[in-house]
Amino acid sequence: MEMKNMQLFADNPTVNVTTDSGLSAENKTFYDRALIEEAQPNLIHGQFGQKRPIPRNGGKRIQFRRYASLPKALKPLTEGVTPEGRKLSATALEAEVNQYGDFVCLSDVLDLTAIDNNVLEATKAVGRQAGMTLDTITRNVLQSGTNVYYCPKVAANGQTTPVTDRQGLDKTCVLTVDVVKKVAAMLKAANAPRIAGDYVCILHPYVAYDIMSDPHWEDMHKYCSPENMYEGEIGRIAGVRFVETSEAAVYKGEGDECPAGLAVFGCLFLAEGAYGVTEVTGGGLQTIVKQLGSAGTADPLDQRSTVGWKALQTAEILMEPYMVRVECCSAFSPTAEAN
């Protein structure tokens, strides 16, 4: 099996064309479902965003809406008099939708009358790749937010020193319960709405290791039923639910302006309505299966079949005050690599 390089397709992203000549509708549905099932667990960063369907015949741009808060209604009502009321103010934010995709080549014969194990395994492999690719695209947008908090330095006597930039971090600048409480307070002060009663933090397993040993840590089974758990959720502390992924941002080296020899982790604290993403279902992510012989003269001996994926994706920050990027080090910072 040979993996091809990632490519950005230049075709019109609104055209929903999948060439699967000869595949039955039943098999096509099966492979589409298998692809999405493999991709879904890797879509950690997109699960808390405002979802928008991909545009149909609407060009390469998608629109998200940001609603302004209403002012307090402090004027007492007069009996029998209807107040003037207010208009709901919405700001439209547009983002460009791009198309991504990749494929693998198979030399085995594709049996179009039954579900083929090789094709299924290839579908699972490209599904995992699709999920990680789309998740990284969303992650990179969210990591570009301007609302940043740097974990303070902690001396041996417990005294803390504020840090004002990434290069100022050192190995003592780890995520603590006190930091979590401060960031939660920042979101509360911004009147940022909670997600199902709590704020959410997406963090790397190396950072999770540092904070899970705190005595106030709650394992997820103690406060949440399995059907209400987020993808990747590991626990809660101080009103913040933590979601773990190895794809959480890790920075390292001079190019990322990191302290010498130490990796820096970007932890995303999120409230409801902080950002928007395109939906994966409904045509946002497609399977493309090409049978042997479908390439014509490009494959004169009918030696190749392919399994691939194609997706439309974008993400957009909608409310900067509703998200905070906390940058910190970890016990694993000396050995962790950038991603």
State the predicted function of each range.
Residues 2-96, 323, 337:
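N-terminal "assembly arms/tails" that initiate or stabilize quaternary assembly
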Residues 59, 99, 196-198, 237, ...:
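Extracytoplasmic
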Residues 64, 124, 128, 201, ...:
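Hydrophobic alpha-helical segments involved in membrane association or supramolecular assembly
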Residues 110-189, 337-338:
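Alpha-helical scaffold segments that mediate packing/assembly in large oligomeric complexes
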